[in-house]
Amino acid sequence: MRTIALFLFIFSLILTGCGGSSVITTEDGRELNGQQQREELERITSMIENGNFTFTVQSVNPQGSSPIYPSTEYTLSAEDGTYRAYLPYFGRSYRAEYGGNGGIDFEGEPEELEIETNRRRNKVTVRFTIDQPDEQYDVTLEIGAGSYGTMTIISPYRRAISYYGNISG
């Protein structure tokens, strides 16, 4: 009898602990739940659809390597539909440019721009391609309702790389 009671007690603790929390904490420490999360997601979606936002990098995660925390501010910014990025690149390059800076540097209007809002998972996904004279970048940006997200960049001449940071407008 004692073991059954102990088992039920432990089982109820596990169920309570695994219930999860639907509270999201934003970058500035605010806790959002329910309606606030939906409003924040709509605000982020609006910023992205209007083409006016800045994604600020907090850490860089090269494929097959440990995270790197840059001491300089790197951003992907969109202003009036023009996307600009100057980002560090750590990883394998399959074609090195002589005298180049080695980073990911682009400016222009995105091609194949696709914005998808997933209200069930509280995130916005942005996919686009940027063609530069010497390189093409396929960019995927996923932002959650807490304004924190992941940006992954794929190029035919480099290994994929991910950047973690937050979005602001």
Protein language model regions, located:
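Helix-rich interaction surfaces within compact, conserved domain-sized segments
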Residues: I24, G108-G169
